[in-house]
Regions:
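A long, amphipathic alpha-helix that forms part
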Residues: 111-120, 149-191
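A generic fold-level signal
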Residues: 31, 124, 160, 183, ...
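Active-site/pore-lining binding-face segments in mid-to-C-terminal subdomains
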Residues: 196, 230-231, 244, 257-261
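Histidine-centered active-site microenvironments of extracellular/periplasmic hydrolases
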Residues: 5-9, 184-185, 191-233
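Flexible, surface-exposed loop regions and adjacent strand-edge segments
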Residues: 148-151, 206-208
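C-terminal, low-complexity/hydrophilic appendages and adjacent surface loops
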Residues: 222, 289-306
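Active-site-proximal alpha/beta segments of enzymes that process anionic O-linked groups
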Residues: 1-148, 224-226, 248, 252-280, ...
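Active-site rim elements
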Residues: 44-45, 155-163, 176-177, 214-218, ...
Length: 306
């Protein structure tokens, strides 16, 4: 992402409008189910309490809630997150089965149901939390695009990945415009639930260079966990970059702080956006075992992208 120093300008909206940028945010896990189950429920890396989650937290605080999803509603990788989503007051899934089954749908198709929610008035003393769960750059990134990717390097998988970042940035711009037209103050919190790394099997076992490999899930590299977390607010100006290290295991605390909710069950909810590093930085591997971040390997950008 250009917002985080990438050379191609694939985030023009965030470059201009991001007010708070967490430079060193790490996802709770290496894939969507692990990351969101531990990041959006009362967990902190231990047993998951799925009934205490971001939706129930918001509802208990009196917020109207909506969950709009371009991910799957059913399946091995989707049902657990879907169970959280269906606790919201308003629920829309573009897909009725798994994320990779049936007719392809694209993230910008969530704008219409978003607009429908925004058109439903709320009492003047009530707020609303709207969650948009998108596909973003999920493998295979070429499947996330409605058109051929632009050419940046001689690797189409990489080209598609770059263009999905640009596509997500454009989606955030559309959401921002819709919120502006609502005439109400608003705040947007954007984050990714995991990163990707170059697939070692595709370049170590097939005698090709790393720059020609594809991007996949893994739990061995820092890049599998290093993710964007950005706030865009109608009442903020300028851009603040926070270099504090944060694990997605504290994400629910961060969402609570963003929403202005305080509870003893979320001990980090008053300091998630502080400039102090988390004391013990851990993430979860594929087996949901805690591993220290400083033990992760590095998967740097290939030379043709520097």
């Amino acid at each position: 992402m250009h917002l985080y120093g990438f050379k191609y300008k694939d985030t023009p909206f965030l470059d201009k409008h991001a007010n708070i940028v967490m430079n060193n945010m790490l996802s709770a896990g290496p894939n969507t189910p692990i990351s969101l189950l531990h990041g959006l429920t009362l967990s902190h890396g231990t047993s998951i309490n799925i009934q205490n989650n971001v939706i129930t937290l918001a509802k208990k605080a009196g917020l109207d809630t909506a969950w709009l999803s371009n991910q799957g509603a059913l399946g091995q990788y989707d049902t657990s997150i879907s169970s959280i989503a269906h606790q919201a007051n308003h629920v829309t899934f573009l897909k009725t089965t798994g994320y990779d089954f049936g007719i392809r749908s694209f993230d910008d198709q969530l704008i219409a149901p978003l607009q429908k929610i925004l058109n439903q008035p709320l009492p003047s003393n009530r707020s609303r939390l709207i969650v948009l769960h998108i596909m973003g750059s999920h493998p295979n990134p070429c499947d996330r695009l409605p058109q051929q990717a632009h050419h940046y390097v001689d690797n189409n998988n990489t080209n598609c990945y770059i263009d999905t970042i640009r596509q997500t940035d454009n989606l955030l711009s559309q959401i921002y415009t819709a919120l502006q037209h609502s005439g109400q103050p608003f705040s947007m919190l954007y984050f990714s639930d995991h990163g990707l790394s170059h697939d070692k099997n595709s370049y170590e076992k097939n005698s090709i260079v790393r720059s020609e490999s594809i991007l996949r899930h893994n739990d061995c590299f820092y890049q599998n966990y290093h993710v964007p977390l950005v706030i865009v607010s109608s009442d903020l100006t300028g851009q603040l970059r926070n270099k504090a290290q944060r694990s997605g295991l504290e994400l629910l605390d961060g969402v609570a702080q963003w929403l202005g909710i305080s509870t003893p069950q979320l001990p980090y909810s008053e300091k998630f956006f502080s400039k102090l590093n988390s004391s013990q930085l851990h993430v979860l591997d594929f087996h949901q075992r805690l591993q220290p971040v400083n033990k992760l390997q590095n998967d740097p950008l290939p030379a043709n992208l520097l």
